[in-house]
Every structure is written in structure tokens, then in C-alpha cells.
Amino acid sequence: TEEKPFPCSECGKRFARRQHLTDHQSSHTGEKPYACSQCEKYFPHRSNLNRHLKLHKGEKPFPCSQCGKRFPCVSDLNIHRRVHTGERPYSCSECGKCFKHHSNLTNHQRTHTREKPFSCTECGKGFKDRSSLTVHHRTHTGEKPFSCTECGKGFKDRSSLTVHHRTH
């Protein structure tokens, strides 16, 4: 077995490489320093961002045997299978609500703690997740990166564009 001289001070898990420890520690802090330049998503590790970028490139070599939907990596396919099985392995210790994704549980738990760890540098308003902060920040910058293909009107987030599309 490989020697693992780098322990996590938070949970004790040990790693063979310092970089692996550094990557792991973001699971405790919730830090997501790697941003996708094409959309409003952030990731805790460069490998997560690289996997996500495959979506923008259209690389999806792993098909679901039940519905045919394709995925950029096996782990995404395995998570997708929960749609068919109904599995929700992450449960809230406060209220018992269950989630398919750990990140959804983490964001949900902030509704109980009222924690808002992401603050706007312009006005100080706090948010429970980074993507909400990103969208809010556009109210200050005026950025509207989502445009309607029918009329050209711009929107600060994808959901507003989706609602707008229904008017055409």
C-alpha cells in the first residue's frame, strides 16, 4: 500500500500527495474556485471543471442503458441512474428530506442554519450558494449573458430567459 503522509486536519483522512489533500479540504470549506467561462457554474476541483467543459464541447461517450441519455463521464452516468431508481442517498439530519446529490443537501442545510457564506462585494448581501451570488452580481454590472434567439432581449440568468421564451 502507498504511504499517505498528508492528513486532513478536519477529518483525519490521509493522502499520498499534498495536492490531493488540498483538493479534499475544499469538501469541508465549500470553496469552489474553478469557474466555467461559458456558464455560471463553479467547481471545487480543476478535474470537476474539466469534466463539466466536456458538456460544452458535446463530448458524451457514456449512454444510459435505460433511456439513452449520454454523459461525459461514468460518474455522471451513475448519478443519472438515480433518476430511474429513485435513489436519494443524501438525507438532512434536521428534517429528513433526501437528495440525489450531496451539493443539493449542503445547499438545503443552509435553509436550517440560515448560513449565507457567499457575500456580494458591492452591497454585502449574503447568499447560500455561489451561483445565486453570481446572478445577483449581474444586477450591479448590468451583465445579461443569456439572450433570446427570437428577439435578442438579454437576461441575467437562464431561468428568466426560459420564462421569457414562453411569451413567443
Curated annotation (Swiss-Prot):
SUPFAM superfamilies attached to this UniProt entry: beta-beta-alpha zinc fingers (SSF57667)
Function: May be involved in transcriptional regulation.
Keyword Repeat part of the UniProt annotation: yes
Alphabetical UniProt keywords: DNA-binding, Metal-binding, Nucleus, Repeat, Transcription, Transcription regulation, Zinc, Zinc-finger
Stored Pfam families: zf-C2H2 (PF00096), zf-C2H2_4 (PF13894)
Taxonomic lineage from the root: Eukaryota, Metazoa, Chordata, Craniata, Vertebrata
Name listed for the protein in its UniProt record: Oocyte zinc finger protein XlCOF19
Zinc finger C2H2-type: from-to: 6-28, 34-56, 62-84, 90-112, 118-140, 146-168
Keyword Transcription regulation: yes
Cellular component annotations (GO), alphabetically ordered: nucleus
Signal peptide coordinates: none
Domain of life from the UniProt record: Eukaryota
Species annotation: Xenopus laevis (African clawed frog)
GO molecular function, one term: zinc ion binding
Record-stated family: Belongs to the krueppel C2H2-type zinc-finger protein family.
InterPro entries, A to Z: Znf_C2H2_sf, Znf_C2H2_type
Localization terms from the record: Nucleus
Gene3D superfamilies reported in the protein's UniProt record: Classic Zinc Finger
